[in-house]
Amino acid sequence: MHTVRLDRTHTGSILDIGGGGEGIIGRLYGRQVTAIDNRREELDEAPEGFEKVLMDACEMSFASASFDHVTFFYTMMFIAKDKQRRALAEACRCLRPGGTLEIWDAAFERAEPFVTELAVYVAADRIDVSCGVWEEGASQNLLRFQEMAGGLSLSEEVCEEAEGHFYLRWRKNTA
């Protein structure tokens, strides 16, 4: 089981892509969060306390530069490989200059299927989460997302990798 510890570090508005289900970012930041998910049942399952919107990450209806932060918390594995670059580009479009874009996810060579167990600590609460991909042939790794971010007016700030999981944070360029 992989452990993720989250603390409140952001001020301002947060767009959480794939924020249904356990609603981890929404639990942490509450009303600061607008969580989108393309599955109604995931949004219905998420706890209350933050805005939830049914929306596709590749075609967001938000105005450009609408959010101070954009997060993907174990979401990319659920976005088809051929749509991930578009989702990142849309996230960057919605991000204000100087804002941060963050990805937490798992690296895996091949889904046959792939399942990972997480112990997520949100303040003093522990939330056990299972994430899995059943699409045969699916794979992802840190390097792929670093390459995808190229050309998106982002400067890499943090890159951490441990136990088959990774965390990336970029800041959107101001000019």
Residue map of PLM features:
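A short glycine-rich, Lys/Arg-flanked "PGG" loop and its adjoining helix->strand segment in the class I
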Residues: R85-P97
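C-terminal alpha-helical "lid/dimerization" subdomain adjacent to the S-adenosyl-L-methionine
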Residues: W104-C159
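A short acidic, Gly/Pro-enriched loop at the edge of an enzyme's catalytic core
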Residues: C58-V70
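A short SAM/SAH-binding and catalytic strip from SAM-dependent methyltransferases
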Residues: H69-K83
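Conserved alpha-helix/loop element of class I SAM-dependent methyltransferases that forms part
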Residues: M1-T11
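Class I SAM-dependent methyltransferase SAM/SAH-binding core
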Residues: L15-E59
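Core SAM-dependent methyltransferase catalytic element
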Residues: G150-A175
